[in-house]
Regions:
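Conserved beta-strand-loop-alpha-helix hinge in the C-terminal portion
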Residues: 226-252
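A short, flexible loop at the N-terminus of ABC-type nucleotide-binding domains that lies
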Residues: 1, 10-24, 74
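ABC ATPase NBD coupling module
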Residues: 15, 57, 69-83, 91, ...
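Helix-to-loop junction immediately C-terminal to a conserved catalytic motif
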Residues: 53
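ABC ATPase C-loop
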Residues: 162-163
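The feature captures the beta-strand-to-loop junction immediately N-terminal to the Walker
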Residues: 38-40
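Conserved ABC transporter NBD signature motif
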Residues: 61-68, 229-231
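H-loop/switch region of ABC-family ATPase nucleotide-binding domains
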Residues: 206-207
Length: 264
């Protein structure tokens, strides 16, 4: 479903601020993989997601999504294959529009140049059923402005919008990092439910090692623009945070320096 072949990306090359962000990165995701991505600050996690999304072009290498070479495609054209949720709950929704209007935008994205006038009764019932699954009471607030929602409600709505058209690949860039622990747990529960229900191939960046172990069927750890650990299946299920830290230290020869990753 996703192939990253020998990907390189350097920012500010030839200057005092030169930074090698991706350094010969290779990764293959099978259809239905739910991969959690961890690593210290500057490891290349977000750069990898941005490279896949086309936010910036890679210097070398090849990116293939569902058998299609998208390496040279613009971010706009790649959006047809992708769903994405960012860290900031304010990103991904239109604050001044109603919940149902936001869902209508997501549903019609890429299908027509102009929005249809109004929302049909059939669409409204469909949105109610979709929102009911979230368990947040939003199905009774279809006309409420999204700007009035809590951060958790808004992020759950963004997640629903990002997956409405069943994307080939779902990218989650620390999408619970700005939420309180209780709300983050709820959004992760919703994430797991949607990903499993729709069999979505997913990459989820997190700084929380326990979340990385709890969710998904596969875990990768990055360092200096490369993948240094790739754990899946039964091996992943048996891991503890301590085991994971030990494996990191063995693979890298360093201690893991990001204390926030130890939170559970």
């Amino acid at each position: 479903m996703l192939e990253l072949k020998n990907i390189y990306k350097t920012f500010n090359p030839g200057t005092i601020n030169e930074k090698v962000a991706l350094n010969g990165l290779n990764l293959t995701l099978n259809e239905g993989d739910f991969v959690t991505v961890i690593g210290g600050n500057g490891a290349g996690k977000s750069t990898m997601l941005n490279a896949v999304a086309g936010t910036w072009m890679v210097d070398e290498g090849q990116i293939i999504i569902d058998g299609i070479d998208v390496t040279k495609l613009s971010e706009h054209k790649r959006a047809a294959y992708l769903g994405r949720v960012f860290q900031d709950p304010m990103t991904g929704t239109a604050a001044t529009m109603g919940i149902e209007e936001n869902l209508a935008l997501a549903k019609r994205r890429g299908k027509t140049r102009f929005l249809k006038p109004g929302i049909t009764k059939k669409e409204r019932e469909e949105y109610k059923e979709l929102l009911k699954i979230l368990g947040l009471g939003l199905e009774d607030r279809l006309t409420s402005k999204v700007g009035l929602l809590s951060g958790g409600q808004r992020q759950a709505l963004t997640l629903l919008m990002a997956t409405l058209q069943k994307p080939k690949l779902l990218l989650l860039d620390e999408h619970t990092a700005a939420l309180d622990p209780k709300t983050a747990a709820k959004v992760l529960e919703i994430t797991e439910m949607i990903v499993n229900r729709d069999h979505l191939t997913t990459m989820m960046i997190t700084h929380n090692m326990q979340d990385a172990l709890t969710h998904g069927n596969r875990l990768i750890m990055m360092m200096e623009g490369k993948i240094i650990l790739d754990i899946q299946g039964e091996e992943k299920k048996k891991l503890t945070v301590r085991n994971l830290l030990d494996q990191f230290e063995k693979a890298s020869g360093q201690e893991f320096s990001n204390d926030s990753a130890l939170l559970s």
